[in-house]
Every structure is written in structure tokens, then in C-alpha cells.
A protein has these predicted regions:
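N-terminal alpha/beta PP-like core and its mobile active-site loop of ThDP/TPP-dependent enzymes
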Residues: 1-101
Length: 101
């Protein structure tokens, strides 16, 4: 089992049902593993900031942590505005970023 497979399996075991993501080369193993985890639905966005804000809204409404998956470099930093907003309001969020190495 790859680490990427373990991440999504574990989150699914913990009750995660939705992930907000932007695909990218640095996160391809994560994207591939997520596509094979049948218990989690993914919502593709066009920008990482939108993923983080959607996850924050999801967490506020559902009471479950919002989960974000982004690619490396700018993908991770683009999500920061939404992450800081969630942190300031104590909204639970899990952010996973790919890594090239």
C-alpha cells in the first residue's frame, strides 16, 4: 500500500465523505489514490483558494472537518487565505499538499 492510498483510506475510516481539490503533477499519487477510494467523493475546483473556502463552508455546515488536497508549491500557498480564515474562526480543516520528491 502506498502512503497516498493509506491517507485516503484512513480519512475514509474516520468518516471523511468529501474532499475539495485541484489536481496537479506534484499530487498525482494523491489524486490517483483518491480516485480509487470509493467512500470519498471529490469536488474539483479551479483554484486552491476556492478549495479551502469550500472546505471551510462544508465544515461549518456538516460539523465534520473540511478536507483540501492541492498540488505542490503555489498550490499550497494559494490555499493559505482560506486556511487562515478557518483557523481564525476555529473551523476544523485538513489540508494535504503533494510533494515532488
Amino acid at each position: 500500500m502506498r502512503v497516498a492510498d493509506w491517507i485516503w483510506k484512513t480519512l475514509a475510516d474516520w468518516g471523511t465523505e468529501h474532499v475539495f481539490l485541484v489536481t496537479g503533477g506534484g499530487a498525482m499519487h494523491l489524486n490517483d489514490a483518491l480516485g480509487r477510494e470509493t467512500r470519498i467523493r471529490y469536488v474539483c475546483n479551479l483554484h486552491e483558494q476556492a478549495c479551502a473556502m469550500a472546505a471551510e463552508g462544508y465544515a461549518r455546515i456538516s460539523g465534520k472537518p473540511g478536507v483540501v488536497s492541492v498540488t505542490t508549491g503555489p498550490g499550497g500557498t494559494n490555499a493559505l487565505t482560506g486556511v487562515v480564515g478557518a483557523w481564525l474562526d476555529s473551523v476544523p480543516m485538513i489540508v494535504i499538499s503533494g510533494q515532488i520528491k
